[in-house]
Amino acid sequence: CIVTTIRFFAILSMDYYILGGIIMLDFSSEVFYRGECFYAYKYFGAHITDGGVMFRVYAPAARRVELIGEFNGWNGENSAMKNDGRGFYELFVPNACEGQMYKYRVYQANGRIVDKADPYAFASELRPGTASIIASLDKFKFTDSKWINSRTKLYDEPFNIYEIHFGSWKMPNGGITEESKPDELWYNYSEIADELIAYVKEHHFTHIEILPLAEHPFDGSWGYQAAGYFSATSRYGKPQDLMEFINKCHNNGIGVIIDFAFVHFVRDDYAMGMFDGTPLYEYPPSDVNQSEWGSYNFNLSKGEVQSFLMSSAAFWLDIYHFDGIRMDAISNAIYWMGNKDRGINDRALDFVRKMNWNLDNTFRNVILIAEDSTDFPNVTRPVEKGGLGFDYKWDLGWMNDTLEYFKLDPFLRQYHHNKINWSMAYFYNERYLLPLSHDEVVHGKATIVNKMWGLYGEKFSQARSLYTYTVSYTHLRAHETDQYLV
């Protein structure tokens, strides 16, 4: 494996892989364990080859791993995977084919036997099922090369983002009901493309930001507790449907950003938690093992976890042609448990810098956005200049102060102008993006209109003033608006 070193970071050279394809010629376990592998999904997972499918999984402490699936009647007795001595198990199955479901039966170090979904699966069974699915990702042919080659980071151009949750932007048959069949609950990725693109263009948005699409078990969530970091949720269709959606967006001049939750993951038994009977992806049992949301915290100090997450971020940009990544809960990576009093998580910060540097230097003008509620400095400063390497940071302070201001009686606002002008005291410290996001309309917080002062009819004029103020804020041209706001 050829490695190019930039200060204390490393990026795998691009000629080491079959780019544009999905199968890796060779693989360096040393690079993987160092946390410098950027394309682990080209090695692990289920890969269709001539005559069958090659399966590989990382489970170093497992006593035995069996491959079970539709191709062997879910009986793994004669399908034990080979341990190659590096912590990797593999098995070639000549009769396996695309579309078949599978799992790994892991004989764990703690004595349990658990059927696990593939952490590197490219597709997943529609919930409530939890199996992985053999999928080919090279069938769809993108026609967006002109867009990809001309996109920029929009530092000096209009940047107006429309944030959506794919499952609730518009739902057929009035939405989710107990009588609905599982495959009738949502529109397909490609089905909704034309209508959504027309809406976005009509309202002069430049980008669509989609709440997390990584496979997740709970319909009622937005997808922030993921189980499949290389698997676009099957709720809205197959991988090719999502590719078609993004391709249509690009050919209509619309960029697409994905929300990426890399700090924590779902605790469900079929997923990555205690994968081989040890805390393989998460921190060992301690006060940092679980997040404030009840999920497992990724152990961002482990090289193999870093390789997993870097590869996931690269996967969405490489395979699906996303134009940017909005990284969730950065404060929980900067500080232990997101608590400034507990100190800085240096290993996690080093990982964030490494991931951002690699993404920025591999994918042409990809946009990296931090959802960060702290005052930690240099979030949007380049890595080579000592920063974290993000292009934009959500200005959550501006959002909170501005919404508080617009709740006030107009007569009383003269005593609270500090809520409007305070953000200018730190405005030039970072490259900020002004968010009016989903976080502000949930858990009884009310819509934007209902946050405004006045009787119901008066609230709409206040909301118009808010949006006008937002888009005219100093010279900044980066804004983010959510589907739920009005």
Predicted regions and their residues:
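Short proline/glycine-enriched turn/loop motifs at strand-loop junctions of beta-rich domains
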Residues: Y58-R64
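Hydrophobic alpha-helical segments, chiefly the membrane-spanning helices
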Residues: L485-V486
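Beta-strand signatures of extracellular beta-sandwich domains
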Residues: E66-I68
